[in-house]
């Protein structure tokens, strides 16, 4: 049985996807009203295909609770807010969730961190939190990082079709987790180290941010010099190795 911790924009679709594809799932969230809404048969946000996925998961037996479950696999999908003053990701919710897992988990349980974190976050914050209570990583508990790669508005489709990265200390554990994601993911799933998985997510987002910034900077220059940026981009994109984005409002979304 998989206990998905955090039933927000990533955790809920992930839980529903696994449940509707044959995995026994219990979703956990501290928000009592959210859990009550889900148990009443209603979704908590709108997303293309989510209602149909929810119905399929309910028929398959998914359950929702405010309690952490005693099991051997957890998926942590809680917020990692950005501190605008320190310009760092706050991992406190991830650490708190892992600490709660350790109170109930079976020996050898797998804890998958899906939350977006910066490179080194698991080493700096999650591992010490586990070791502080006397758990031995690799024996009492196994750590895995499987960063999500979805975008709001197309989440259900991308959960199925996007490629995935799974980072693990032990490749055997990584392959075991891969089997769960393979239940619904039709994309390629690559198993690597935890730090590499952390880095790939940040690099992917940075690549997008840089390209968005480039298009917007180009628009600013063209506006200053009274040139048509859209015509220039169209001509430049005729080159087989050039693909400039269209100018827009800038970067956005939780991950970027």
Which positions does each model-derived feature cover?
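Structural/interface elements that position substrates and couple domains in central-metabolism enzymes
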Residues: 1-256
């Amino acid at each position: 049985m998989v206990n998905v911790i955090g039933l927000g924009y990533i955790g809920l679709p992930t839980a529903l996807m696994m449940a509707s594809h044959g995995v026994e799932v219990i979703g956990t969230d501290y928000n009592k009203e959210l859990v009550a809404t889900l148990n009443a048969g209603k979704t908590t946000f709108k997303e293309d295909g989510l209602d149909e996925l929810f119905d399929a998961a309910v028929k398959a037996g998914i359950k929702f609770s405010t309690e952490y479950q005693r099991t051997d696999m957890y998926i942590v999908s809680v917020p990692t807010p950005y501190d605008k003053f320190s310009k760092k990701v706050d991992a406190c919710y991830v650490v708190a969730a892992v600490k709660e897992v350790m109170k109930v988990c079976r020996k050898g349980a797998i804890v998958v961190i899906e939350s977006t974190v910066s490179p080194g976050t698991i080493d700096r914050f999650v591992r010490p939190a586990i070791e502080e209570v006397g758990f031995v990583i690799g024996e009492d508990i196994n750590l895995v990082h499987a960063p999500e790669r979805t975008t709001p508005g197309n989440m259900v489709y991308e959960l199925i079709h996007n490629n995935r990265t799974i980072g693990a200390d032990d490749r055997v554990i990584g392959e075991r987790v891969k089997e769960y994601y393979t239940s619904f993911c039709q994309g390629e799933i690559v198993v690597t180290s935890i730090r590499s998985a952390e880095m790939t997510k940040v690099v992917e987002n940075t690549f997008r941010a840089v390209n968005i910034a480039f298009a917007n900077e180009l628009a600013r220059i063209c506006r200053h010099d009274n040139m048509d940026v859209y015509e220039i981009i169209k001509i430049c994109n005729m080159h087989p190795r050039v693909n400039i984005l269209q100018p827009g409002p800038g970067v956005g979304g939780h991950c970027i």
